[in-house]
C-alpha cells in the first residue's frame, strides 16, 4: 500500500490530538496531505501528539466537537476534500462516570460534523466516521459480528457509538442519497501500539508498570478482544476514504479487525507483552468485584472489508507486541519519537 493518492489532498481530521489521531496525522503529513485537525487539547500527559513532531506540518485547531460554531469555522476554512471523524469520548469506564458528556460528544459531535458537511459551500467528496467494534448488541457469541447485526451497545460509550452509526446512516440516506458525498463508517477493534498513554487501557497500564518496576495488574484477563496494531485500522480508514473518493459505490459500513488467530484474551496479550519486554516482566490477576459491565467475548467478521478491497491484516499479535515494546523503550530512553513513528509506518506500508 502506498499513500501517494493523499499528496496535496485537503484532509480534515477530528480527534487529531488523540492516540489514533496522532498516528493518522503522521501518516498523512508524511504522504504530503494538507491536514487540518480539530480536537480538544491532548487528553493525557505525556501525549503522542506533542511527541510526534507535527507542529508546523499541519493546521491544529483546538476546539470542542460539541461547539458547532467553532467546528464549522475550522471546517469551512479547511475546505476539505476528505473528512476522517475520530473525535470521541473513547473509554468505557469513563462513560459510566459521565454518560451525558459521552453522549454529547459521541452523538451530537457526529451530528455537528455531518452538519458541517451538509452545509458546506463545496462539500467534501469522502467522509469516514470511525466508530467501534462495540456498536453491536453483544450476545457473547464465539463468532465474529457482521455489519448487518443489530446495533445496540450496552454501556454508555458503546451505545453512544451505536447512535453515532445511526446518525450517519440517516444523514447518508436523507441528504447524500445522490452519492455526491460518499459516506462510510468503520467499526474497528481494540488498538495497541506505541504512544498510547490513556488510563484504563491494557498496554499503557503495562508500560507504566514496567517504568515503575512493578508487576502488571490485569482487570479482565479472560476477556477476548479483537486486538490489532494501531496502523492496521488507520491504513484501512485511508483505503476506504480513498476508494469511495474515487468511486462512491464503495461507501458503506465496514468492520476492521484482526484475523481469528489474533483475537486473544487479555491475559494472552499481556503474556506476549511480558515476553517481548523481558527483564522479568510479569502480571497478576486483579479482577475487581462489582466492576462496571464490560463485554467478555467480542470478535469481528471482516469478510466484507477483505472481499471489497482485498485488504488483509499485516502484523500478527506477536509482531504487534514487538513493535509496541520497541516504541515504548525508545520513549522511556528519551529517543526520537518522530523517527520511530516514520520507521514503523514505512515498515508497515511496505508489507
Predicted regions and their residues:
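N-terminal Rossmann-like NAD(P)+-binding domain of SDR-like oxidoreductases, especially those catalyzing
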Residues: 1-188, 348
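Generic structural signal for small/hydrophobic residues in well-ordered secondary structure
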Residues: 6, 16-18, 83, 171, ...
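Residue-level marker for well-ordered alpha-helical positions
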Residues: 22, 69, 204, 267-268, ...
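C-terminal substrate-binding subdomain of Rossmann-fold SDR/epimerase-dehydratase oxidoreductases
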Residues: 30-33, 63, 210-351
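Flexible, glycine-rich phosphate/dinucleotide-binding loops
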Residues: 43-44, 136, 192, 262, ...
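Residues in well-ordered alpha-helical elements
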Residues: 68-69, 81, 93, 100, ...
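NAD(P)-dependent short-chain dehydrogenase/reductase
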Residues: 139-144, 148, 156-157, 162-245, ...
Amino acid at each position: 500500500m502506498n499513500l501517494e493518492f493523499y499528496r496535496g489532498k485537503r484532509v480534515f481530521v477530528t480527534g487529531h490530538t488523540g492516540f489514533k489521531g496522532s498516528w493518522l496525522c503522521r501518516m498523512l503529513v508524511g504522504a504530503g496531505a494538507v491536514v487540518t485537525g480539530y480536537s480538544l487539547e491532548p487528553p493525557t500527559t505525556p501525549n503522542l501528539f506533542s511527541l510526534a513532531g507535527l507542529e508546523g506540518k499541519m493546521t491544529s485547531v483546538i476546539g470542542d466537537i460539541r461547539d458547532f460554531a467553532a467546528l464549522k469555522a475550522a471546517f469551512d476554512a479547511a475546505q476539505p476534500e476528505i473528512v476522517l471523524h475520530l473525535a470521541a469520548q473513547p473509554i468505557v469506564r469513563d462513560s459510566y462516570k459521565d454518560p451525558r458528556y459521552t453522549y454529547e460528544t459521541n452523538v451530537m459531535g457526529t451530528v455537528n460534523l455531518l452538519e458541517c458537511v451538509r452545509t458546506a459551500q463545496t462539500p467534501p467528496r469522502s467522509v469516514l466516521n470511525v466508530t467501534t467494534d462495540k456498536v453491536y448488541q453483544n450476545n457473547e457469541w464465539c463468532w465474529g459480528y457482521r455489519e448487518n447485526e443489530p446495533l445496540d451497545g450496552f454501556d454508555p460509550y458503546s451505545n453512544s457509538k451505536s447512535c453515532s452509526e445511526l446518525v450517519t446512516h440517516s444523514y447518508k440516506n436523507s441528504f447524500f442519497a445522490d452519492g455526491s458525498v460518499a459516506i462510510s463508517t468503520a467499526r474497528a477493534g481494540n488498538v495497541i501500539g506505541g504512544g498510547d498513554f490513556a488510563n484504563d487501557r491494557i498496554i499503557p497500564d503495562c508500560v507504566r508498570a514496567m517504568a515503575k518496576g512493578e508487576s502488571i495488574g490485569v482487570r479482565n484477563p479472560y476477556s477476548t478482544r479483537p486486538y490489532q496494531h494501531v496502523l492496521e485500522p488507520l491504513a484501512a480508514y485511508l483505503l476506504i476514504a480513498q476508494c469511495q473518493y474515487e468511486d462512491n459505490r464503495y461507501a458503506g459500513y465496514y468492520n476492521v479487525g484482526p484475523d481469528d488467530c489474533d483475537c486473544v484474551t487479555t491475559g494472552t496479550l499481556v503474556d506476549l507483552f511480558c515476553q517481548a519486554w523481558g527483564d522479568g516482566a510479569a502480571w497478576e490477576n486483579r479482577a475487581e468485584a462489582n466492576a462496571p459491565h464490560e463485554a467478555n467475548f467480542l470478535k469481528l467478521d471482516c469478510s466484507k472489508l477483505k472481499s471489497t478491497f482485498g485488504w488483509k491484516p499485516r502484523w500478527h499479535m506477536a509482531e504487534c507486541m514487538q513493535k509496541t515494546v520497541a516504541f515504548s523503550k525508545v520513549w522511556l530512553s528519551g529517543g526520537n519519537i518522530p523517527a520511530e513513528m516514520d520507521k514503523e509506518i514505512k515498515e508497515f506500508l511496505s508489507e
